[in-house]
Amino acid sequence: MSCPIDSKKLEEICLEAAQPVLKASEYDGDKTAEMNQSVIYAVLNALNKETQSYKWIVSSTLVQKLPEDHPSRGVHAAHAACWNCEKDGMTTIKESGEAIDVVLSIMWISI
């Protein structure tokens, strides 16, 4: 099923939530838990304002960008669920900053 929120609106929500992280000029491993938490809660709050007809699940992955002369850092993530394919679904959105990429997985489950 397609997302119950327009894809452009969903992209705006994710970009706005990720902006503070994307503005970072360097990756600070000591702050990643706090950064992830702030992004997730910002997305969840915005989604709940848009519609309360769904339960929302948001996961966030922060990926450190490395210098061009350094080999690319590999990251792999996977999600699976059992649900009603006509009413429930998921999507992934990636936002890129100078030092960090933010990958958000958003799942919706009808109530």
Swiss-Prot record:
A Pfam short name: Tctex-1
Gene3D superfamilies: Tctex-1
CDD domains documented for this protein: DLC-like_SpDlc1-like
Keyword annotations: Cytoplasm, Cytoskeleton, Dynein, Microtubule, Motor protein
Domain of life: Eukaryota
Biological processes annotated in GO: attachment of mitotic spindle microtubules to kinetochore; dynein-driven meiotic oscillatory nuclear movement; karyogamy involved in conjugation with cellular fusion; microtubule-based movement
GO CC annotation: cortical microtubule cytoskeleton; cytoplasm; cytoplasmic dynein complex; cytosol; horsetail-astral microtubule array; meiotic spindle pole body; microtubule; mitotic spindle pole body
Protein name as catalogued: Dynein light chain Tctex-type
The organism of origin for this protein: Schizosaccharomyces pombe (strain 972 / ATCC 24843) (Fission yeast)
